Amino acid sequence: SSPSLTAQVGGMYLPSVGGVADPNALYVVWGGGNDVRTGDPAVLTNSVPNIVNIISALAAAGATNFLVPNLPNIGLTPEAQAGGPAVVAGATFLSVTFNGQLIAATAGLRSSLGVNIIDLDVYAFLNTTIANAGALGITNTTGRCYSGTTGIGGPGTVCANPNEYVFWDGIHPTAAAHALLGNYASSAIPVPAAAWLFVSGIAALGALRRKAA
């Protein structure tokens, strides 16, 4: 399995840079998706605290600039939809719960650590993307383009028009949706962005397939 975000930062990234984070980098810290996917509210107990610890560790190492996306509505993913109304409702509830805890936590970190934190509202982004799908060239907002097992190298079939889908598989976005999200994230970074020339992605969209924290 993939290493947790905590392991990625404390066991991989920081040792690789001698424990000194780049103060001019923009650190993207994104997690929680797999915790929500469990459907178990108890799993969320440590989700946001772990993200707080990750940001605190990076800040202690010298990082000053962070982009912290929240979670999309996991209830909108093909995986959740296939589970039926109860699974959808549970995933939506946990997504909202996690996001509420996260926004409160980042507000506290700004004050306690004195760092720059940009909150990226991916929940709103996905809702808006689906609502405006036609104008964006998207024709399928609920299905999965790839029909095989989630993961790398698994057997399966691919749809003929992946750029018209929001979801690649049961949980991950397509390249087209990734591009839209990238533009959205870029627009959230204040000018002058030139001050943050290097982006260090502690977790990108793949966060949904990794353990959250």
Where are these regions (language model features)?
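Conserved SGNH/GDSL esterase-like catalytic core that processes O-acyl groups on lipids
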Residues: 1-49
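Mobile gating loops/cap/lid regions near enzyme active sites that modulate substrate access
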Residues: 73-97, 104, 108, 114-171
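Stable alpha-helical elements in mature extracytoplasmic
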Residues: 5-9, 47-54, 94, 98-105, ...
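A short, hydrophobic C-terminal helix/tail in secreted or cell-surface proteins
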Residues: 191-208
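A recurrent domain-boundary module in secreted/ectodomain proteins
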Residues: 170-188
